[in-house]
């Protein structure tokens, strides 16, 4: 059972460390998003929702995970591998927060995908149809749906793994369909612009701006896919045989990858959005100058 000790040690230290990284990174990104003026309002609101979910992951859920794995490590060091001694209330609270925040992220990313699809498809009509009020209603609906989804996971323990797998599969499918459609629409409009030269300058600029925004959202989705994809087979394998220690290790490792996604998103924002990168540089310089003045 030394494997459990080693895994618990790694996950405890890693979750504590990345909890700090995730929290600081998303606090800086949230500040930058509020100050950014070049990002479309609807995209900004959706990314703010995603960043707040990631902040909740780092500030609460991942920190709790580090504590739980530290407790597991402590009990394992005493040659006690009975994990049922862990407080059920704490475990359920951790799982609830984990699935609430992850469901919110999944639904927000799906919304971003379809928002970008509407943007590249509708062009100038997009602002008329996709209003800030409607985006706000969607974000409230996402919070309520995430709340209910997390409750289902907690109160249906015998089938919660399958619920998680189904939700992930549906999310993967919808986002993939949206981005494939975005690619086709962008390709079609590119051919129009290059072959006809009949589009008005304003419409051409808007099409190019929405195409760039769609590509930026695609990178966020790609990072999400890399971090979440291993979780699906690990859940299925663990559901088939809960007594196999290797399946349990795979599941815990895939959970850490999901947490890692919340640390990587701020990096993607900085990479893909020049204004966010500049605001963050300015903020960090101010913090460093303040630190120098204090010393």
Residue ranges: model-predicted function:
Residues 1-31, 69, 74, 78, ...:
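Extracellular N-terminal segment of 7TM GPCRs
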Residues 7-16, 43-111:
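Extracellular TM2-ECL1-early TM3 structural module of rhodopsin-like
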Residues 29, 65-68, 146, 150-153, ...:
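Structural signal for membrane-spanning alpha-helices in multi-pass inner-membrane proteins
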Residues 53, 184-233:
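Intracellular effector-coupling site of seven-transmembrane GPCRs
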Residues 100-138:
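Class A GPCR helix-loop hinge within the 7TM core
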Residues 107-114, 178-194:
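Membrane-water interface of transmembrane alpha-helices
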Residues 145-184:
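Extracellular-loop-to-transmembrane junctions of the mid-late helices
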Residues 174-175, 223-229, 233-236, 251-295:
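Seventh transmembrane helix
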């Amino acid at each position: 059972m030394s494997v459990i000790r080693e895994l618990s040690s790694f996950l405890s230290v890693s979750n504590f460390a990345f909890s700090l990284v995730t929290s600081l990174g998303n606090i800086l990104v949230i500040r930058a998003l509020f100050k950014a003026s070049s990002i479309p309002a609807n995209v900004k609101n959706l990314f703010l929702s995603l960043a707040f979910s990631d902040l909740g992951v780092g500030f609460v859920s991942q920190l709790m995970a580090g504590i739980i794995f530290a407790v597991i490590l402590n009990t394992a060091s005493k040659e006690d591998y009975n994990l049922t001694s862990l407080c059920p209330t704490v475990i359920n609270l951790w799982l609830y927060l984990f699935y609430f925040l992850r469901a919110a992220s999944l639904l927000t990313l799906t919304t971003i995908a379809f928002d970008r699809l509407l943007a590249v498809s509708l062009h100038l009509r997009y602002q008329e149809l996709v209003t800030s009020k409607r985006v706000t209603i969607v974000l409230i609906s996402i919070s309520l749906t995430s709340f209910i989804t997390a409750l289902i996971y907690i109160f249906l323990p015998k089938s919660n793994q399958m619920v998680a797998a189904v939700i992930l599969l549906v999310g993967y499918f919808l986002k993939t369909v949206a981005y494939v459609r975005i690619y086709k629409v962008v390709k079609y409009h590119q051919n129009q612009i290059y072959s006809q030269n009949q589009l008005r300058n304003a419409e051409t600029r808007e099409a190019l701006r929405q195409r760039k925004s769609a590509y930026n959202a695609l990178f966020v989705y790609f990072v999400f896919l890399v971090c979440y994809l291993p979780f699906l087979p690990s859940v299925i394998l663990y559901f088939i045989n809960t007594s196999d220690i290797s399946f349990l290790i795979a599941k815990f490792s895939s959970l850490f990858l999901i947490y890692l996604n919340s640390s990587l998103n701020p990096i993607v924002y900085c990479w893909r959005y020049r204004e966010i990168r500049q605001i963050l540089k300015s903020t960090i310089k101010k913090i460093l100058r303040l630190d120098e003045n204090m010393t």
